[in-house]
Regions:
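Ser/Thr-rich, low-complexity intrinsically disordered terminal regions
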Residues: 23-171
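C-terminal segment of classical bacterial N-terminal signal peptides
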Residues: 15-25
Length: 171
């Protein structure tokens, strides 16, 4: 336990020194990868391998509370309503893509006529959330899944993001 506490304190001290400019990075690294510059650890996490639409469904949420999804029999903590759209499905996915592209620190990873996958990075430490949208022809809605890669709590960020997108899409 003492070792874990020491590692945590040492890690925080190292980050603070790096951010204040008193510690030199140990290797040449692109500063574009993290909004905070060179950190001694990766806060983006690895891209999940279970993303995408399989048999008309997005992947279920993990048990951690930092995920929301509109499909499946999710508990209230994870459940969120799908996105409604009116008119042509192609126009709806195009409008959704434009909304997502306009959001800060967003990278679109995959885009088709019925699926959109984007990564959103947090402003301060560069934590990455994976957000997927699936234009569900059977339900005439856009199913959504938004999940943080790391940690337990997201302080409601994934739910807030989906609700902001819902509001923009309805305009």
């Amino acid at each position: 336990m003492l070792t874990s506490a020491f590692r945590l304190v040492f890690g925080v001290a190292l980050v603070m020194l790096t951010l204040l400019g008193h510690a030199a990075p140990s290797a040449a690294v692109s500063l574009e990868a993290s909004p905070m510059g060179v950190l001694p650890f990766n806060l983006a996490g690895d891209r999940p391998t279970n993303l995408g639409v399989k048999e008309g469904k997005l992947a279920p949420c993990p048990t951690s509370p930092n995920c929301v999804i509109s499909q499946g029999d999710e508990d209230a903590e994870h459940a969120i309503a799908p996105l409604a759209y009116s008119g042509d499905p192609a126009q709806a996915i195009a409008k959704l893509t434009a909304i997502v592209k306009a959001m800060p620190r967003t990278t679109i990873i995959e885009s088709t006529d019925s699926y959109l996958y984007a990564e959103f990075a947090s402003k301060l430490l560069g934590f990455v959330d994976d957000v997927e949208f699936y234009l569900d022809p059977a339900e005439s809605v856009i199913q959504v899944r938004s999940a943080s890669r790391l940690g337990q709590s997201d302080l409601g960020v994934n739910r807030q993001r989906v609700e902001a997108i819902r509001q923009e899409l309805s305009v």
